[in-house]
Design a protein with these regions (language model features):
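An N-terminally biased module of ancient metal coordination in phosphate/nucleic-acid-related enzymes
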Residues: 1-71
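Short acidic, glycine/proline-enriched helix-loop-strand junctions
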Residues: 45-54, 62, 68-73, 194-221
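Short acidic/histidine-rich active-site segments
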Residues: 181-197
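Non-catalytic positions within long, well-ordered alpha-helices that form the structural scaffold/packing
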Residues: 27, 123, 177-178
Length: 247
């Protein structure tokens, strides 16, 4: 649902050899559905230019895949950098294939303005926002009620599998899951060295910390999202601060 495997289009796989290695690792981890979500920033390119470049990279990769002992279902999407002006674009072309789900990336340095209004406007257009790698936003980790408000307003949230392999961060993210603030897990893989695919390890950590039922629900949600189905969202619990700690 979130990866940078297409060759030569962003800061992910630099060529088809790297793309094939990443796909091989995803396949070994049991992944069969992949949405290619290359970076899109409306301040740097147009939707038309981006989708043309994405299609060319996809065709290059599928040609290289011929004869490989791996079978996947693919969709083309984007990791869309947040802007209040997104609603003025053809955001449907940036959703994951034929689904209504749009992967949104926020700045890591500051909380942008007009998030609630933009999420609302997208939903008015039939778009379902999926917030990428929530663990990378300091303002969310420090103030989880922000994410609670966005989820309560109809958005969904994704975490990176690799984040669960960092003990302190895993502990925090488990709280977010228990609050009902995390819906899907993905790899956000860029290369075999920079953010490699670690889906199986991430799921194992989920099972260890929160049990097989919770882990299975989050994995299943990924498949539901890929097929444009409604997600199995856990009951929302508003985080509260007690003695300086979020509970």
């Amino acid at each position: 649902l979130h990866c940078h495997i297409l060759p030569g289009i962003d800061d992910g796989a630099k060529d088809t050899a790297v793309s094939l290695e990443l796909l091989r690792r995803e396949y070994e981890d049991g992944v069969r559905n992949i949405a290619f979500t290359s970076h899109f920033n409306s301040e740097r390119t147009t939707v038309e230019a981006f989708t043309a470049k994405r299609q060319a990279a996809f065709e290059q990769l599928t040609a290289a895949l011929e004869g490989q002992p791996m079978q996947f279902d693919f969709k083309l999407g984007a990791e869309v950098f947040f802007s209040p002006g997104l609603c003025e674009l053809d955001t449907r072309a940036l959703c994951m294939g034929d689904t209504a789900y749009l992967l949104l990336e926020f700045p890591t340095t500051h909380k942008p303005h007009f998030i609630r209004q933009t999420l609302y406007n997208l939903q008015q257009q039939g778009i379902v926002p999926l917030i990428a790698h929530i663990e990378r936003y300091p303002y969310v980790m420090e103030e989880p009620t922000l994410l609670y408000d966005w989820i309560a307003a109809g958005a969904y949230a994704q975490i990176n599998a690799g984040a669960l392999l960092e003990p302190k961060l895993c502990k925090k993210l488990c709280k977010f899951i228990q609050w009902g603030l995390v819906h899907v897990i993905s790899t956000d893989t860029h290369s075999p060295d920079k953010r490699p695919p670690r889906m199986a390890q991430g799921v194992q950590q989920l099972e260890k910390q929160l049990g097989k039922e919770t882990a299975a629900r989050i994995v299943r949600n990924g498949d539901e999202l890929f097929h444009d189905q409604e997600l199995d969202a856990a009951t929302l619990h508003q985080p509260k601060k007690l003695l300086g700690m979020w509970v």
